[in-house]
Amino acid sequence: MAGVFRFSNAVSDIEKFIQTYRSIYEHFYPLTQTGHYFGHKEAYEFLATNGLASSLGAIGQEAIRRSERDDTSRDPLYNQHKMYSEIYRMLGWYEPGSMKTNFNLPEYGDYIAHSDPATVAKLFALNVLHIVSPNPLTRIKGGNILRPFPMIMKIMGALGGYLTRDEMIISVLACPDDRDDNYVSNVADKIRRIRKAGLKDLQAEIDSLKARVGINSKDALPNYTRFPIAAMKWTGWAEGVTTRDLYKGVSVTSLRITQSGEDVLQRISQAVDIRFEDILKYPCDAQAAFSIWSNLYQLKKVGFDISNYSEIIPQLESTAAPIFAEYRVKEYSDMLFFGYQEAPRDILKRGNQLIGE
């Protein structure tokens, strides 16, 4: 049985989260180009020294001194970067190094590091939509089969545009398999029943979930929502509101979908959703060609000029023809799949060989 999709408790300030990555990229990119990786220690020392991370009220070398523990799991600075790194990997901004605790900076990182703010905002929106489990680039605890952000949008759409934090926990983060065609309607019916019954029933559902997955801390489940709630607001897809309309006149805080969010919901509802595991049955070159094609497809939508690849794209489509045929990619108005974020590095490397890069 699937557990709870776990976002690390590191990120509620999306602007800082992005700027921190850009600083990390500029500092460590030359190192990674020599074939070396960087770990949590190198990263947090850089962040603390440059005032981008603090520990126990201090920055710089004093923060590093105060943070050091014999047990790194209790080291505040170590854990700050560890939690950032978990989401950077979900977004495709970090890729695995030689072990779980070190990292490489991918080709895609250059787009995040060097694009203008408006473009970075579009890329971030693209990336959060493509967070997925399972993912060959990172192990996401919980064992869910899930794209969490499209699921958030679909459930909001089914519930009149509103979703509270605890409702997000019991519906989105606890979703075992988003490919169940009945899941959204079933969980929306469940939440409507809970809203009618009152907040006690919502709390009972939370308590039941905690017991099932073995969580004792009262803060753990709410902490998993910090990033998705912040991202929904930062992208402009939702706004935070206080309302008495959901729970019998009781005032609760909730996300409310915006017109921008409605537009995204309509788009993803009409998209073909492909996961890397879907294309594993095809030859390596077909997987690679499709992954590279998806990168160009998504970057063009964001606004990048891909005209230099105009002669290569038909070759990629030919090599990946069985995938295009099975999933009827061109019959849909949109697609959910982004190779930079979802394909293994060896597949992208092979894809670059196919296009002569």
Region annotations inferred by a language model:
Residues 1-356:
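Donor-sugar nucleotide-binding helix/loop cap in glycosyltransferases
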